[in-house]
């Protein structure tokens, strides 16, 4: 409820309570009154030590003629103290001799009525009703101030972060490195918000909704904030998950509240992050067509389609799952413009690194181009984490500035996982060394594979050893020969274990998952099997709550399923056989590489080349 109504009432009640407690405290401190028994009262009266007395029903108060010592409890201990007054209680049996004796000893006697005053009685009966009516009145005023949402007013508020036109945003297009094509498309939105009359003069219309699509960490939210900073208009930011609540109808109410505020502040931008939280296709998943999420989506569709041209409100939204969005969201008039934000290439990665290294102290001899070329596939968020990890490493070593070595170590930590120093037996170490040597040797000898960046038998992350390959450039197409070589490299560790020890271990579990998944994609999605042909099949790709259907639908026969399984197994078997032939022909190099790993634990690409020797003398059987 509105605090401005509660504060005066709370202050009055608090003042009355403090005033009452203060009166009680000072009354008890100022009055020297002793609580005595009726027998003590008669004894003091017999000694003519009572000056005056007041009777009110069975309650008796009075004064002694002089200071009288009476036992009293002080901090839990009984002590003798002097009092000038007393109080007592008369017995229920009427004592006919008390009053005559008081009169005979010339004690001043007063009598008070036991009836409650009429005004006090009225106050006792009326006060609770007055308080209840006041609480009801304050509540109604508060709910009316929240609009038509009634008792659910607190839930119906959108909770969006609002930045008004006068507020200065900390991000602009200058702070967003790379993504030139994406920024160019969004600059049209900024130009419209800055000068809508120019667009209206020539009859152009700006898209009502712009959907930012891209993998996680590529900078979709950052780009939306930059649009707000460049446009200089009101900006409302909210995550789509904030619309959903346990109460039915709250999500739709929050959507209405968000767009009502945006229309009042027009021209404005509404940014909805993770749109797929409410924008998934209706009817997908369990729960039927009347759940809270679908009501929220329906309200969002209605709000976006109900804009008038003079309502200069543009909706930006971000998602990494455009495939699961409802088609009604993507039609012209709603999110009719899609801005695709891909992972940056090495030039954009260098620009992103230049932005992030502004915040740290750097050694002048750092070559960011080398780091950018050595981090293919990394997003802007990954590069920011890399720079931060380098700064942490430099701080841990008490270095004056971040050096190239710190950046390389940070890159390895992100690519290979955090290093774990754990004690393992010599036999376990030997098995790991041969396993990683098998991967490394196969990758080094096969033509067309990615170069070896680093191989180590020091545990990183969840792995006991890591063989890290880095492509020389960003890849957008994967030839079949390249993918088949990846299968061979992945099987190299398992084959090396069998050659060295006569059996395999559980260490190849991750490799087997990798080759099975890759072979399945080659057969079912990329049409690389001659027996299956150029058809695609959905095999474990979609989940009920993420996709367009309630459950995974099988669109092929049992005979085709058997053929797919046979082709997947054939790809893996051929890869294992090729790895076996290659390692058997180069057994001496395998042993040298495994021994070097046991001695040095970590080898970089140049050291691997030095151990293996020239490729001209290496024996690589044809595939």
UniProtKB/Swiss-Prot annotation:
Transmembrane region(s): 8-28, 118-138
Cytoplasmic side: 1-7, 139-623
One GO cellular component, as annotated: plasma membrane
InterPro entries, A to Z: AAA+_ATPase, AAA_lid_3, ATPase_AAA_core, ATPase_AAA_CS, FtsH, P-loop_NTPase, Pept_M41_FtsH_extracell, Peptidase_M41
Cofactor, how bound (note): Binds 1 zinc ion per subunit.
Keyword field contains NADP: no
Gene Ontology BP, a term: proteolysis
Quaternary structure (record): Homohexamer.
Family stated for the protein in its record: In the central section; belongs to the AAA ATPase family. In the C-terminal section; belongs to the peptidase M41 family.
Known role: Acts as a processive, ATP-dependent zinc metallopeptidase for both cytoplasmic and membrane proteins. Plays a role in the quality control of integral membrane proteins.
Name listed for the protein in its UniProt record: ATP-dependent zinc metalloprotease FtsH
